[in-house]
Amino acid sequence: MHTVWKGSISFGLVNVPVKMHAATETHEFHFNYLHKDCHNRIRYIKKCPHCEVEVAAENIIKGYEYEKDHYVIMEEEDLASLEAPLSRSIDILDFIDLSDIDPIYYQKSYYLSPEEAAHKAYKLLCQAMSDTGKVAIAKLTMRSKQHLACLRIIDQSIMVLETMYYPAEIRHLEASWDNVSPTDTEIAMARQLIENLAAPFAPEKYRDELREQVKELIEKKVSGETYRVAAAPEPGKVVDLMEALRASIAMTDQKKQQNTAESETEEKPTKSTLTPRGRRKVKGA
């Protein structure tokens, strides 16, 4: 697995050298922009509007606009000097309960694996965190940014690091609908609908259906097949809330009964009988 960062986990006087690997990947289709007339790729030119010239990469520097059209120049050495003391350490600040973290704070997941000489220290930290049921809040510098992070243990022996947003980066939404109160009957029916739809989390049953359709469309176009563009669905009509709840509950009740019947059928032992010719015949075959 590709290593994206190397450093060490630091807590107290203990240091555990680790490597970081991306835990997720996207399966999006990446399209190129082409010139409609000749189908050649569009080129994006970095041009200075003042000098009216194309600017090469080695002549591009960083600047921060502190007021309109006024910049303070930031040299790479300036930024590197700030990062140097922090760049190779995951500093644990606190150990907390995972349930205390609102998922809105999570950004991206990474695996942490131990360096060859740190297997025992890594396993020790994993075991201690598993036994106490705690996760760690830490800070690290990666890609010119200091990240807040959560370290947690999965399968008792693998450490996952989740980068997190700082509180100042979380937007807040005011609930302008607090003056509306559903009736007790509506709440009871909504709860029943939720109970009907409740199920264990099985991630393998969820699919990116749009991606599958895009893949199929690309394959058809590459092979020269014709295709039909499906009509856009009609916008949903506003219906009575109680009627919608009743209909939804009835639909989920029917589906639950059907699933139960299918499960019972699968669990029944298959009975066999002897035919006049001595062959075994399976009932229902």
From Swiss-Prot:
Organism expressing this protein natively: Desulfitobacterium hafniense (strain DSM 10664 / DCB-2)
Sorted UniProt keywords: DNA damage, DNA recombination, DNA repair, DNA-binding
Keyword Transport annotated: no
Subunit annotation: Homodimer. Interacts with LigD.
Gene3D superfamilies in UniProt: 2.40.290.10
Annotated stretches, region: Disordered: 250-285
Protein's name in the database: Non-homologous end joining protein Ku
InterPro entries (alphabetical): Ku70/Ku80_beta-barrel_dom, Prok_Ku, SPOC-like_C_dom_sf
Summary of the function given for this chain in its UniProt record: With LigD forms a non-homologous end joining (NHEJ) DNA repair enzyme, which repairs dsDNA breaks with reduced fidelity. Binds linear dsDNA with 5'- and 3'- overhangs but not closed circular dsDNA nor ssDNA. Recruits and stimulates the ligase activity of LigD.
GO molecular function: double-stranded DNA binding
Keyword field contains DNA-binding: yes
One matching Pfam family: Ku
